[in-house]
UniProtKB/Swiss-Prot annotation:
PROSITE patterns the record matches: THIOREDOXIN_2
UniProt-annotated location(s): Plastid, Chloroplast
PANTHER family reported for this sequence: THIOREDOXIN, MITOCHONDRIAL (PTHR43601), THIOREDOXIN-LIKE 1-3, CHLOROPLASTIC (PTHR43601:SF31)
Keyword tags: Chloroplast, Disulfide bond, Electron transport, Plastid, Redox-active center, Transit peptide, Transport
Disulfide cross-links: C125-C128
Chief localization: plastid
Pfam families to which the protein is assigned, alphabetical: Thioredoxin
SUPFAM superfamilies per record: Thioredoxin-like
Organism: Arabidopsis thaliana
InterPro entries membership: Thioredoxin-like_sf (IPR036249), Thioredoxin_domain (IPR013766)
Transit peptide: 1-44
Protein name: Thioredoxin-like 1-3, chloroplastic
Amino acid sequence: MATDSFIKLNPISFNRARFDLRDFAGISPKSISSLCCISPRLISCNHFSPRTLISGENGNILFSKKKIPAFVRCQTSLGIGRNQKWWEKELKPNMKSVTSPQDLVVSLRNAGDKLVVVDFFSPSCGGCKALHPKICKIAEKNPEVEFLQVNYEEHRSLCQSLNIHVLPFFRFYRGSSGRVCSFSCTNATIRKFKEALEKHGREQCSIGETKGLEEKELVAMAANKDLSFDYKPTSCGNIQEQKKKEIFLPKSPTFNKQKEVEHSLLLVSPAPA
């Protein structure tokens, strides 16, 4: 009997102690490992055509290595996929995970007049996990609102630059107004989230460019050595800072003396005729 042309498999009792690789001569290791993953319950005469199945010794079933049924190949791939994380489940089309500081900045600026909800969470946060399904349902009912998810464990330095110290935490951004509100929320206080969404989720037209993050937040992100983020303050911001410095600058002694001289001249000047 040509063992290199057939694969022997006992669907009733597969004993690994008596498993012999010589019975699989000519078969690639990948094929052998795939066949070992097949549950005996999945293999029956109903799944194979008579031409494929051949009776062997001791009631074993033989089938050609060149004609492995599609049913078997499909079943071998069932347990290979990666388990989905809880924060990846039930996501809606208007929900997106932030991948970098630059991604957060660009996403906020490209949102235009849309309301953007930034959701700060941690995989180890029980309150975040319990709240996630409700946030997904809210996102489904409000497709015009964009939801950005920021994983605290993956973007710890970013969250610290944005002064995020409580989880779960939410920030709402809209148009030229920038950040319109921010708060912490749990399952017990979900009403706070719904009220903020109702207040800031109404359609409106902003005058001016989309603001996004605040100037001081962008500067803090650029100053953080753990972040790959570059930002140069705008010239308008520099002018405002310069004006603030001029207001609080102390007057020089020369300036004070000049004022005293002018005041004395006014006192001694003759009266007009």
